[in-house]
Amino acid sequence: MKKVYHYIIHYVRTYLLLELLAGLWLTVKYFFRKKITVQFPEEQTPLSPRFRGLLALRRYPNGEERCIACKLCEAVCPALAITIESEQREDGSRRTTRYDIDMFKCINCGLCEESCPVDSIVVTPIHHYHISERGQNIMTKEKLLAVGDLMETQLAADRAADEKYR
């Protein structure tokens, strides 16, 4: 009797394709559920307030750049993506002559932002940028300052909202 039972079970599993029907049932079940896919260019999910996107350099309200060339961000960068050159000014303070970030090396860890004593380098919520030619991966001081000027109002508001956590 056990042998006949074994043959019946083998027949049902082999010829009725129960595994295939179970897989098809799972597919049909999900086919009629609400879709969770986001059509990216047209629709976007909301970003976290602490999202780390494109880097920027900020200025003081009088227009002077904030960076004091302490090179802490260059020292703390684990990917060695930041290159800084500086010189002394007439008044004795240091300012950067070159501030480059290689975006191919940058891992968006945010350590440069945390180490900056004057809030000069910051991360922005910009995540739509592309590189179409060789050499565009280097964010120069001018590009970084331009991004900072563009985003200054939002960056200041984000800093004010995040102040109690810093």
Curated annotation (Swiss-Prot):
Classification via InterPro entries: 4Fe4S_Fe-S-bd (IPR017896), 4Fe4S_Fe_S_CS (IPR017900), NADH_quinone_OxRdtase_chainI (IPR010226)
Gene Ontology BP terms: aerobic respiration
Catalysed reactions listed for this entry: a quinone + NADH + 5 H(+)(in) = a quinol + NAD(+) + 4 H(+)(out)
GO cellular component: plasma membrane
GO molecular-function term, one example from the UniProt record: 4 iron, 4 sulfur cluster binding
Coiled coil regions, renumbered to chain: none
UniProt topology in membrane: Peripheral membrane protein
Family matches, as Pfam families: Fer4_7 (PF12838)
Gene3D superfamilies: 3.30.70.3270
Cofactor(s) essential for the protein: [4Fe-4S] cluster
Keywords, comma-separated and alphabetical: 4Fe-4S, Cell inner membrane, Cell membrane, Iron, Iron-sulfur, Membrane, Metal-binding, NAD, Quinone, Repeat, Translocase, Ubiquinone
Entry's EC annotation: 7.1.1.-
Superkingdom classification of source: Bacteria
Principal cellular location given in the protein's record: membrane
Residues bound to [4Fe-4S] cluster 1: C67, C70, C73, C116
Sequence ranges assigned to domain 4Fe-4S ferredoxin-type in this UniProt record: 57-87, 97-126
Localization: Cell inner membrane
Cofactor note: Binds 2 [4Fe-4S] clusters per subunit.
Keyword set includes ATP-binding: no
Keyword DNA repair: no
Residues that hold [4Fe-4S] cluster 2 according to the record: C77, C106, C109, C112
NCBIfam families with a match to the protein in the record: NuoI (TIGR01971), PRK05888.1-4 (NF004538)
PANTHER family according to UniProt: NADH DEHYDROGENASE [UBIQUINONE] IRON-SULFUR PROTEIN 8, MITOCHONDRIAL, NADH DEHYDROGENASE UBIQUINONE IRON-SULFUR PROTEIN 8, MITOCHONDRIAL
Similarity-based family: Belongs to the complex I 23 kDa subunit family.
Function: NDH-1 shuttles electrons from NADH, via FMN and iron-sulfur (Fe-S) centers, to quinones in the respiratory chain. The immediate electron acceptor for the enzyme in this species is believed to be ubiquinone. Couples the redox reaction to proton translocation (for every two electrons transferred, four hydrogen ions are translocated across the cytoplasmic membrane), and thus conserves the redox energy in a proton gradient.
Protein's name according to its UniProt entry: NADH-quinone oxidoreductase subunit I
Native source organism of the sequence: Legionella pneumophila (strain Corby)
Lineage: Bacteria, Pseudomonadati, Pseudomonadota, Gammaproteobacteria, Legionellales
Gene: nuoI
